[in-house]
Swiss-Prot record:
GO cellular component: plasma membrane
Membrane-topology descriptor: Multi-pass membrane protein
Gene3D superfamilies from the UniProt entry: MetI-like
Protein name: Arabinooligosaccharides transport system permease protein AraP
PANTHER family: ARABINOOLIGOSACCHARIDES TRANSPORT SYSTEM PERMEASE PROTEIN ARAP, BLL4140 PROTEIN
Quaternary structure and partners: The complex is composed of two ATP-binding proteins (MsmX), two transmembrane proteins (AraP and AraQ) and a solute-binding protein (AraN).
Species assigned in the record: Bacillus subtilis (strain 168)
Inducing factors: Transcription is repressed by glucose and by the binding of AraR to the operon promoter. L-arabinose acts as an inducer by inhibiting the binding of AraR to the DNA, thus allowing expression of the gene.
Function: Part of the ABC transporter complex AraNPQ involved in the uptake of arabinooligosaccharides. Transports alpha-1,5-arabinooligosaccharides, at least up to four L-arabinosyl units. Responsible for the translocation of the substrate across the membrane.
Keyword Lipoprotein: no
Taxonomy, superkingdom: Bacteria
InterPro entries, A to Z: MetI-like (IPR000515), MetI-like_sf (IPR035906), UgpAE/MalFG_permease (IPR050809)
Amino acid sequence: MKPVKTGTVHPVPSAAKQSGWRDLFYSKKAAPYLFTAPFVLSFLVFFLYPIISVFIMSFQRILPGEVSFVGLSNYTALNNPTFYTALWNTLEYTFWTLIVLIPVPLLLAIFLNSKLVKFRNIFKSALFIPALTSTIVAGIIFRLIFGEMETSLANSILLKLGFSPQNWMNNEHTGMFLMVLLASWRWMGINILYFLAGLQNVPKELYEAADIDGANTMKKFLHITLPFLKPVTVYVLTISIIGGFRMFEESYVLWQNNSPGNIGLTLVGYLYQQGLAYNEMGYGAAIGIVLLIVILVVSLISLKLSGSFKGEG
């Protein structure tokens, strides 16, 4: 008999090894990491990396083809009247927008949430439309409404009411009023939707029990509505603060760089002016870092005052 030739036998991967990666992919331990990976990657690429880069740039003098380390020179250069004017304008603008964009949307949301109001969807749509309007278009509309001519809409109304016309665009006080009014007009609808969403989560049984106990409207508002709206209120407060410190478009479309008494100069506008218009990238980066710190501090203070750091017991 001829000997039987045998070849090299290669081991076939076991089913367990073949399904190893599949089991890891579908395992409960890996699922949280897989779902959070897109957010973590986007956070690292679009948030953390730019912050680190800007922080490094704030200690440098950046010129075309030349980068030199200057230490704290960019930060010490912030000690000037123009920077303090921009900081004060930003704080004042943020304060007045908070005064408008927190209580007014809350009251309007309660009004729209009432069953007695007809055509609620029409009102909701009408209030949300300004948020979809381009800032440039909104700025042009406001420049026409509040023009310096007596024939402008705002001055025509004042004349009919017996008041003298105002030079809205060239006065510091009316200039701040215009910026706050423009921001309030644009973002009022969004805050209303936030509060409306919060009102939908308030149990109706609590209001019914309060009616049985004889509670009036104010007591129901203070002891039922407000406590349940606290998370939404804190969120709206936080994004409104951040939006206030980020303000640039409203001022730019109204005056560009020629606002009366520099009333339209904000921290973001000052950053744009120094970093891009004057090509002082290092100095602009220092302004950006200071802006980030101010936003973090103010946001933490607002969260602390609202009691968000207290443990629920």
